[in-house]
UniProtKB/Swiss-Prot annotation:
Disruption phenotype: Slightly impaired growth and fertility. Plants lacking both eIF4E1 and eIF4E2 display pleiotropic effect on plant development but are resistant specifically to several potyviruses including potato virus Y (PVY, strains N605, LYE72, LYE90 and LYE84), tobacco etch virus (TEV, strains HAT, CAA10 and S103), pepper mottle virus (PepMoV), Ecuadorian rocotto virus (ERV), pepper severe mosaic virus (PepSMV), pepper yellow mosaic virus (PepYMV), and potato virus V (PVV). Plants lacking eIFiso4E, eIF4E1 and eIF4E2 exhibit a semi-dwarf phenotype. Residues 21-33 have a biased composition (Acidic residues). It comes from Solanum lycopersicum. Its main location: nucleus. Component of the protein complex eIF4F, which is involved in the recognition of the mRNA cap, ATP-dependent unwinding of 5'-terminal secondary structure and recruitment of mRNA to the ribosome. Recognizes and binds the 7-methylguanosine-containing mRNA cap during an early step in the initiation of protein synthesis and facilitates ribosome binding by inducing the unwinding of the mRNAs secondary structures. Key component of recessive resistance to potyviruses. GO terms for biological process: defense response to virus; regulation of translation; translational initiation. Residues 1-36 are annotated as: Disordered. GO terms for cellular component: cytoplasm; eukaryotic translation initiation factor 4F complex; nucleus. This is Eukaryotic translation initiation factor 4E-2.
Length: 221
């Protein structure tokens, strides 16, 4: 079950009006009066333990000839809870993304690529969802990340949502795949946070690079 912090944050989001949040994917403009009023109301922001960066891999920018990961671009880096919500409430959620899109949220200065030194010896847990059914679990995953809810939080690199024709996949990337104790703990906690009942598997990045889709799960929970 998602923890109380995640529930409270989700309820706050649900209770906000459409005017407060803006339409899906719309970047909401501000009048001078609105900006001034907000500046007076928000006197203190709540810093996160880590800064995080959203990355987007646009399907229209992908090419079979291009190197993997060459079309991934950083979108925004945030370091407070308020800045997270400001960005999250004004971007498309997974159900509204185009097929082929990949949206990432990684600790700042860690690129969502196998080649990144922090990710190089890591791996990933993956959850599968029917098309259009991952929005809430994606939000809960983000809240667990930025809220430092994992016991082995230092192992976390970030998360990615992959939108495909028949399904959506959320993957949680970690840095030290060989640390079975840490990886199993992360997998179990992630399932609890999202109230996810199906078995999930952990694949080493090294296996994925060598075997592609033939790579097998090293751990399962």
């Amino acid at each position: 079950m998602a923890d109380e912090l995640n529930k409270a944050a989700l309820e706050e989001y649900k209770s906000s009006s459409v005017e407060d949040r803006g339409e899906e994917g719309e970047i909401v403009g501000e009048s001078d009066d609105t900006a001034s009023s907000l500046g007076k109301q928000i006197t203190m922001k709540h810093p996160l333990e880590h800064s995080w960066t959203f990355w987007f891999d646009n399907p229209s920018g992908k090419s079979k000839q291009a190197a993997w990961g060459s079309s991934i671009r950083p979108i925004y880096t945030f370091s407070t809870a308020e800045d997270f919500w400001s960005v999250y409430n004004n971007i498309h959620h997974p159900s509204k993304l185009a097929v082929g899109a990949d949206f990432h949220c990684f600790k700042n200065k860690i690129e969502p690529k196998w080649e990144d030194p922090v990710c190089a010896n890591g791996g990933k847990w993956t959850m599968n969802f029917s098309r259009g059914k991952s929005d809430t679990c994606w939000l809960y995953t983000l809240l667990a990340l930025i809220g430092e809810q994992f016991d082995y939080g230092d192992e976390i690199c970030g998360a990615v949502i992959n939108v495909r024709v028949r399904q959506e996949k959320i993957a949680l990337w970690t840095r030290n795949a060989a640390n079975e104790t840490a990886q199993v703990s992360i997998g179990k906690q992630w399932k609890e946070f999202l109230d996810y009942n199906d078995t999930i598997g952990f694949i080493f990045h090294d296996d994925a690079k060598k075997l592609d889709r033939a790579a097998k799960n090293r751990y399962s929970v």
